[in-house]
Structure formats: C-alpha cells, structure tokens
Amino acid sequence: MVSIPEYYEGKNILLTGATGFLGKVLLEKLLRSCPRVNSVYVLVRQKAGQTPQERVEEILSSKLFDRLRDENPDFREKIIAINSELTQPKLALSEEDKEIIIDSTNVIFHCAATVRFNENLRDAVQLNVIATRQLILLAQQMKNLEVFMHVSTAYAYCNRKHIDEVVYPPPVDPKKLIDSLEWMDDGLVNDITPKLIGDRPNTYIYTKALAEYVVQQEGAKLNVAIVRPSIVGASWKEPFPGWIDNFNGPSGLFIAAGKGILRTMRASNNALADLVPVDVVVNTSLAAAWYSGVNRPRNIMVYNCTTGSTNPFHWGEVEYHVISTFKRNPLEQAFRRPNVNLTSNHLLYHYWIAVSHKAPAFLYDIYLRMTGRSPRMMKTITRLHKAMVFLEYFTSNSWVWNTDNVNMLMNQLNPEDKKTFNIDVRQLHWAEYIENYCMGTKKYVLNEEMSGLPAARKHLNKLRNIRYGFNTILVILIWRIFIARSQMARNIWYFVVSLCYKFLSYFRASSTMRY
C-alpha cells in the first residue's frame, strides 16, 4: 500500500475553511509533510476590504507557517486562492474557477462551518447544511474526484450517551427544514428553534448532525469519509507544541482563569474533558482521506476523533493543571491570582458568581470611575458568563465514543506514517499538553513575550500580598465587632493571641538553644 505522502503526490486538493483554526493547520501540514502535492485550491471570500489572495497571504505570513517556510520556501506557489462565498447560490464561483475546480480536483477537505454556538438557526443552516449540500453537488460534477472528506463534530449526536462511528437518522428532514426557513420570518424562526433542536444544546450541534445526513444521502455515489473531532485544542506537537490563535472553546476560559477573572464555573470534576489536539485532528483527516482514496470502501467511513475512551482526562484535572501552570508562568497584568472553583451545585455556583465575579468587578469599576477611567470589568464578566453558559453542557456531561475505525486506521499506517501522521493519543501526556496549551495562549493569542515573566511573577506576588493584607484586616474588623459585644468572643480572642505569643516565644527560645 502506498504511503500517505505518496498518495498525495501530484494530487490537486480543494480546501474550505482555510481561514479557520483547523483549516490553517491542515493546510500547513499538507504542504509540509506531503511536499509533492500538486496544488491546493483554497475557497476564500472577500472580507473587510481584503481580496481572497490578500487574506490567504495574511494567513501564510503567520508564525504557524514558520517551520514550513524554513523547510520549503517555495510552498506559496502551490496555493491557489479562489473567490467563493459558501452562503451564496452555487458558492458564488465564477464560471472560470468552477471549470478549473471540476477538471482538476482529486480530494476535497470540507472544514468550513460556523462554530458560534449562539448562531441563529437560519444562518447556521445556511453555512453548515446548505453550503455542504452545494459543495456535494459541485463534487458530483468533478471528473477526477477520489475522496470527499467532511469534518463534523463528535457532539453531533450528543443526545446519545454512546456514539458509534455511524451516521444516525437526523432529527428532521434537512430538505423540509430548508424549505420551511425560506418562508419563515426571523421572529418565527427564533420562536421554534428551542423545539427544533430539542435535547441538543445549540444550533451548531444541531446543524452539524443535519450536515452529516446530507453528506450521506447526497454524496451516496461519492467516496465519502467523515471525521468527528471532540473539543479541538492547541497543537500537541506540530508544527510546534501549543499553537493556538483564538479564544474559542476552552482557550478563552484558560485565559480568563490565568488572568484571575474566571473564579468559578459550573462543571463536574469527574466529567470527561474530551480535548483533542488540532494536529491529531488534521493527521486523522489526512490519513482517513488516504485510506478511502486507496481502498475505496463500500460504505461511508466515520471516524470519532476523541480521547476519552483511550486516554481519559477530567475537568477537575484540567482545572488543576491550568491553575498550576499560570501560577508558575503568569499572564501579564492579571486581575487576581489564578484560582478556579468547579461546582455542579446550582446554589453554590450562583453564590460564587456573586462573590467572586460580580462583586470584585463592580468594585473595580468604581475604582476606575474614581480614577477617571472608563469602567470595563462588568462588561468583561458579562461576556465571560455568556461563554460559560454555552460551554457548561460539555463540562458537566460525559459521553462514550466508539473509536474502532480510528484504531483500524492507525493500524493501517506504515511505521514512517505513524510517526509523521501521529494519531495515537495514548502517547499524549496531559500535564505537559495543558502546560504547552496555556503557554500557547500567552504567546500566540495574547502576544506576550516570555521575557516578561519576571515582571508578571512580581505582579502576582503583589496581588497575593494585597489579598493577605485585605483578609487580615477583614478578620481583625470582624473580631473587633464581636469582642465589643460578647464576653465569650473576647475570651476566645485573648486565648488565641496568648497561644500565638507562647508559640512565638517557644520558637524563639528553641532557635536560640540551637546556637
């Protein structure tokens, strides 16, 4: 059987979602590890006055591509940016570009999707379902297409506790939903959304399940594979450890925890934190397309790209390692010292929200007003709480994913491909990964230099001293209030003070005796 780089040699690849986190890493890995690929057509829309070519050039200039620039300086020649709008009819392709794609494409990687959990249903259906269907229809016209690779999510069927590597029946017929959305106004769509999505937590999950069914039905005559990653996190190894460039998912929470803003979160300490590194998802996608292209299986291949069943990690452990990392290597200008309390108790959660989030933010905004600055902390806390609401479903529940196809795929790789396209998450050391992840948010998301660590540590020590001083004053005030009114409290106070004095006297005497 040919190796993965040999399979992609001379191939023309069509990639959607190249401006997204996963798409960027896939593009880099494909060009670096399969250097003899012929060309990569990247579907990109114009945005903010930038042409598709300018947007692609901006991506290629990022640190993510530093290693590729060193190993293959001419890689840009293989990338062809094509103006396309996935939400428009026929993907808004020009006739010339369409003809080139139809004649040349060998493998499609469909990574584009709206990942906003609070997206309204109409927009989520447009990008996640209708755009996928239009891409399938385009793929059916391609003369040399070998594989259609669709990236979904492991949570598409989160209404089930055990999820196999199959496409389940959809909650509603996608065609009927699309037809209905054409005549419904936005108000009606918003009203019926909760009933439609049912026991799924958001429109993203709901529409990704519909998209899988569309791929299965509309792409029945194509050679299709589906990869379902769980919570995609920073890179494990490639192109270097800890690469992350966004606030999505756990990244934003890690940063908020490191800044001392996030103090409590509704989560179960024992719930599985099914994080999967982005490079594992990319390697799985490239390997899955290779397997389908070489073996042409009779049925659609689905791969649950998860970690919980083979290398379990829990949210309580995530919290411990994140806080430990940011205490050793703090973020600059932290609001408070990092400390997070996870709880699944409703009343306790709201108590900590009031005491640890809203009260300090309110007092800090008063301080900002008094010093002539614009208050901002309550707005930050409000945004944080909205993000927490969307994520608490995933931090409070656990699922079991079957990974037989992933295990089969891993066994099909030759020894060299197992190293180059590593998908064996049993080798993943979680403590090291979380530390690299946290440092990645510091370096690549917040753009903080490691040379600033001494100052950041000094600032954290200052916050610690302020906290100890505040707590000491608070205890003294409380005791003084009780002492003034209660003889018993006064006796206890004098007893504690005398005990401390005796202890200090004994310690001083014993120290003197040693000399």
UniProtKB/Swiss-Prot annotation:
<keyword id="KW-0443">Lipid metabolism</keyword>
<dbReference type="GO" id="GO:0046474">
    <property type="term" value="P:glycerophospholipid biosynthetic process"/>
</dbReference>
<feature type="transmembrane region" description="Helical">
    <location>
        <begin position="466"/>
        <end position="483"/>
    </location>
</feature>
<keyword id="KW-0444">Lipid biosynthesis</keyword>
<keyword id="KW-0560">Oxidoreductase</keyword>
<comment type="similarity">
    <text>Belongs to the fatty acyl-CoA reductase family.</text>
</comment>
<dbReference type="GO" id="GO:0080019">
    <property type="term" value="F:alcohol-forming very long-chain fatty acyl-CoA reductase activity"/>
</dbReference>
<dbReference type="GO" id="GO:0008611">
    <property type="term" value="P:ether lipid biosynthetic process"/>
</dbReference>
<keyword id="KW-0812">Transmembrane</keyword>
<keyword id="KW-0576">Peroxisome</keyword>
<dbReference type="Pfam" id="PF07993">
    <property type="entry name" value="NAD_binding_4"/>
</dbReference>
<keyword id="KW-0521">NADP</keyword>
<dbReference type="InterPro" id="IPR026055">
    <property type="entry name" value="FAR"/>
</dbReference>
<feature type="topological domain" description="Cytoplasmic">
    <location>
        <begin position="1"/>
        <end position="465"/>
    </location>
</feature>
<protein>
    <recommendedName>
        <fullName>Fatty acyl-CoA reductase 1</fullName>
        <ecNumber>1.2.1.84</ecNumber>
    </recommendedName>
</protein>
<keyword id="KW-1133">Transmembrane helix</keyword>
<dbReference type="Pfam" id="PF03015">
    <property type="entry name" value="Sterile"/>
</dbReference>
<dbReference type="GO" id="GO:0005778">
    <property type="term" value="C:peroxisomal membrane"/>
</dbReference>
<feature type="region of interest" description="Necessary and sufficient for PEX19-mediated localization into peroxisome membrane">
    <location>
        <begin position="451"/>
        <end position="507"/>
    </location>
</feature>
<dbReference type="GO" id="GO:0102965">
    <property type="term" value="F:alcohol-forming long-chain fatty acyl-CoA reductase activity"/>
</dbReference>
<dbReference type="GO" id="GO:0035336">
    <property type="term" value="P:long-chain fatty-acyl-CoA metabolic process"/>
</dbReference>
<keyword id="KW-0472">Membrane</keyword>
<dbReference type="InterPro" id="IPR033640">
    <property type="entry name" value="FAR_C"/>
</dbReference>
<dbReference type="GO" id="GO:0005777">
    <property type="term" value="C:peroxisome"/>
</dbReference>
<feature type="topological domain" description="Peroxisomal">
    <location>
        <begin position="484"/>
        <end position="515"/>
    </location>
</feature>
<dbReference type="InterPro" id="IPR013120">
    <property type="entry name" value="Far_NAD-bd"/>
</dbReference>
<comment type="function">
    <text>Catalyzes the reduction of saturated and unsaturated C16 or C18 fatty acyl-CoA to fatty alcohols. It plays an essential role in the production of ether lipids/plasmalogens which synthesis requires fatty alcohols. In parallel, it is also required for wax monoesters production since fatty alcohols also constitute a substrate for their synthesis.</text>
</comment>
<dbReference type="GO" id="GO:0010025">
    <property type="term" value="P:wax biosynthetic process"/>
</dbReference>
<dbReference type="InterPro" id="IPR036291">
    <property type="entry name" value="NAD(P)-bd_dom_sf"/>
</dbReference>
<comment type="subunit">
    <text>Interacts with PEX19; PEX19 mediates the targeting of FAR1 to peroxisomes.</text>
</comment>
